[in-house]
């Protein structure tokens, strides 16, 4: 009897302990939810106040300039300390100091090389920074200097890459030598930019070419008609809309659209031929792409070499400066509350990946 009573008492105590635990956990969750809600509410108020205060202020970026010679020097010194013994290090240090002293005494002024980067998406969004970087360097660059653009782009919108190319043309017009380095891809609009360089250097397996124009869009008119849905397209002007997504496309509209593509292609060919007259433009303007090895034979590039190799060589005889214009992020972008910005970047990211494979 006593053993049975003890077992029942322990069972009741265990049951009470579990209930108390559940109640405590529920209260804790409720408290945590209230705390999170309060913190979020405070953040929303602070962000709103900051946004109202910053409204109307002009957002400006900042030009960042780094000397690449220091980077290469650090790599060299790191290798020296890892490989050489104390005596060899001492001798190397003396030799470097002596060479620097002789250069200073002789009054030798090394030419400057301004290094830019362009990583292009469909909209050539990097043009926003490129235009300011070019404006900045042209205030200092001389015909004895050089501009090196490390270019990566599979192309995109005609007008966007037309503007990016026009920015590079400013360098040529100023009489400053322009070298284009391509490590992975410069196709379609990317090659439109590359051809402006006085010298084009590519990696052996970089993808180049795609001198052509493409446009594609779906048409759901028959689907809408099947479900008795009308979609009106009203225009003023015979060719205001040639092809549409929802309206009924006509053969006349298709012919006009194709004519516009051909016109754009001819302008593209003329632009490339203007800057690289050595090309057989009709032979290479077929929309095809070539790897660097084959592109060299067709004179699409002038030399096979990676950008790393080229810059390391130039660092031995010139002062290298890397320029990057960083756009000032808006408050919404910094806090991460702008869903439309995030969505836009997500879509552009995936379209760019597709673009790199199809070379629009």
Task: Cite the ranges covered by each PLM segment.
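N-terminal organellar transit peptides
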Residues: 5-9, 14-179, 184-186, 199-203, ...
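DNA breakage-rejoining catalytic core of tyrosine-based enzymes
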Residues: 190
């Amino acid at each position: 009897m006593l053993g049975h009573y003890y077992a029942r008492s322990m069972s009741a105590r265990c049951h009470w302990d579990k209930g108390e635990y559940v109640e405590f956990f529920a209260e804790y969750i409720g408290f945590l939810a209230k705390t999170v809600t309060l913190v979020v509410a405070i953040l929303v108020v602070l962000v709103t106040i900051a946004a109202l205060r910053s409204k109307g202020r002009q957002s400006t970026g900042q030009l960042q300039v780094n000397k690449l010679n220091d980077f290469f020097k650090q790599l060299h010194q790191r290798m020296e300390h890892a490989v050489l013994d104390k005596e060899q290090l001492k001798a190397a240090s003396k030799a470097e100091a002596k060479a620097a002293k002789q250069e200073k005494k002789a009054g030798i002024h090394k030419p400057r090389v301004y290094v830019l980067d362009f990583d292009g998406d469909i909209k050539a969004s990097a043009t926003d920074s490129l235009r300011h970087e070019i404006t900045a360097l042209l205030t200092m660059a001389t015909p004895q200097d050089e501009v090196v653009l490390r270019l990566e782009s599979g192309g995109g919108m005609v007008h966007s890459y037309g503007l990016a190319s026009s920015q590079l043309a400013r360098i040529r017009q100023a009489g400053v030598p322009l070298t284009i380095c391509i490590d992975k891809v410069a196709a379609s609009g990317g090659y439109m930019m590359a051809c402006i360089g006085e010298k084009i250097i590519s990696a052996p397996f970089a993808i180049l070419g795609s001198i052509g124009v493409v446009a594609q869009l779906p048409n759901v008119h028959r689907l809408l008609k099947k479900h008795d849905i009308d979609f009106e397209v009203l225009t003023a002007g015979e060719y205001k809309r040639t092809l549409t997504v929802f309206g009924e496309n006509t053969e006349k509209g298709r012919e006009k659209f194709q004519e516009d593509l051909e016109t754009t292609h001819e302008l593209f060919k003329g632009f490339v031929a203007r800057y690289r007259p050595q090309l057989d433009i009709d032979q290479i303007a077929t929309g095809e792409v070539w790897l660097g090895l084959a592109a060299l034979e067709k004179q699409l590039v002038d030399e096979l070499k990676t950008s790393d190799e080229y810059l390391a060589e130039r660092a031995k005889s010139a002062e290298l400066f890397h320029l990057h214009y960083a756009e000032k992020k808006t408050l919404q972008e910094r806090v991460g509350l702008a869903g439309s910005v995030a969505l836009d970047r997500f879509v552009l990211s995936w379209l760019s990946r597709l673009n790199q494979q199809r070379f629009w």
